[in-house]
Amino acid sequence: MSSRVGDLSPQQQEALARFRENLQDLLPILPNADDYFLLRWLRARNFDLQKSEDMLRRHMEFRKQQDLDNIVTWQPPEVIQLYDSGGLCGYDYEGCPVYFNIIGSLDPKGLLLSASKQDMIRKRIKVCELLLHECELQTQKLGRKIEMALMVFDMEGLSLKHLWKPAVEVYQQFFSILEANYPETLKNLIVIRAPKLFPVAFNLVKSFMSEETRRKIVILGDNWKQELTKFISPDQLPVEFGGTMTDPDGNPKCLTKINYGGEVPKSYYLCEQVRLQYEHTRSVGRGSSLQVENEILFPGCVLRWQFASDGGDIGFGVFLKTKMGEQQSAREMTEVLPSQRYNAHMVPEDGSLTCLQAGVYVLRFDNTYSRMHAKKLSYTVEVLLPDKASEETLQSLKAMRPSPTQ
């Protein structure tokens, strides 16, 4: 039994009837009170009536808080409309709408310096509501129920700038909202053009996805254009992605449907920095330095840092220890990121690097040049690990590449 309308076991049919009875007070205000809608919440909680009811009631509170009945007409700030990438374009073979997420050309820092995180997340909630609305239109058009959407994530150009903590938090919160409020609406999440950094990025958001959602993720290899046509008919797929669809003017990217983002002009900036919270606060004495060690167990991990100083600028560099178990000076270690002085007392600094080898990496905060003033340092340092399953998938896809002809 698929636990869908028309394919329910007697126990599931009884659970649906009891679920409807328990929700008598909510039925008049639900966005949809048919069996298809109610079964989404039951499937999401394995037909546990109490858990399903709790989930749906929390969703109705969320709808009220976010004014979801009117969100489709809400217009986000201009900078989000112009530079936040993505778009609804085409339908899969069963008529489900397809939404493209363009990650590489996204300027996360520019967007978050120009708009609030709440507006960034609200725009993504609006996309979810638009997709449900599109499903309803498809249901009316095709004469059969369409209740799921397909998402394509184009990861070409994914880089360390996309791992900036405030930007990652937007996607973490979005996937958390998706799981709690839009169960059983994602048909597949297809990843194309995934670079080596993808497993690290995925590991940052996967804990916010249910196991069911993770099972729906499909990572395509080098022949992704051909593989994509197994999900979406070529006439419903832009030329840019291996199909035959173009804009009316012949543009292969279908710019009238998909926003490809881009760098946000500084004229949109509302502030020079995003307010951050730091995990540690230390004093770096005059004429001294502070070393923060992080052990990297295998290549491919990413070191990510954020820091601010009080009392003046501070030097910063990254080094790799050459001897384990003992303190080393900067000149005794291998320089990975050259040390330089940062005006972190004026603008907080953040950055990251991919560790190419295992070992102990030292983030060195340098105040040796200051003979008069100690510096108060606030900082957060994290080691981002790659998701092993997706890393192995990428490696296996790479191994399947045909050898170049001689």
Curated annotation (Swiss-Prot):
UniProt domain GOLD: residue ranges: 252-383
Keywords: Lipid-binding, Transport
Family matches, as InterPro entries: CRAL-TRIO_dom, CRAL-TRIO_dom_sf, CRAL/TRIO_N_dom, CRAL/TRIO_N_dom_sf, GOLD_dom, GOLD_dom_sf, SEC14/CRAL-TRIO_domain
Gene Ontology MF terms in the entry: lipid binding
Highest rank taxon of the organism: Eukaryota
GO cellular component terms given for this protein: cytoplasm
Covalent S-S links between cysteines: none
A Pfam entry, by short name: CRAL_TRIO
The keyword ATP-binding is assigned to this record: no
PROSITE patterns, A to Z: CRAL_TRIO (PS50191), GOLD (PS50866)
CRAL-TRIO domain residues: 76-249
Classification via PANTHER family: SEC14 RELATED PROTEIN (PTHR23324), SEC14-LIKE PROTEIN 4 (PTHR23324:SF42)
Main function: Probable hydrophobic ligand-binding protein; may play a role in the transport of hydrophobic ligands like tocopherol, squalene and phospholipids.
Protein name: SEC14-like protein 4
Taxonomic lineage from the root: Eukaryota, Metazoa, Chordata, Craniata, Vertebrata
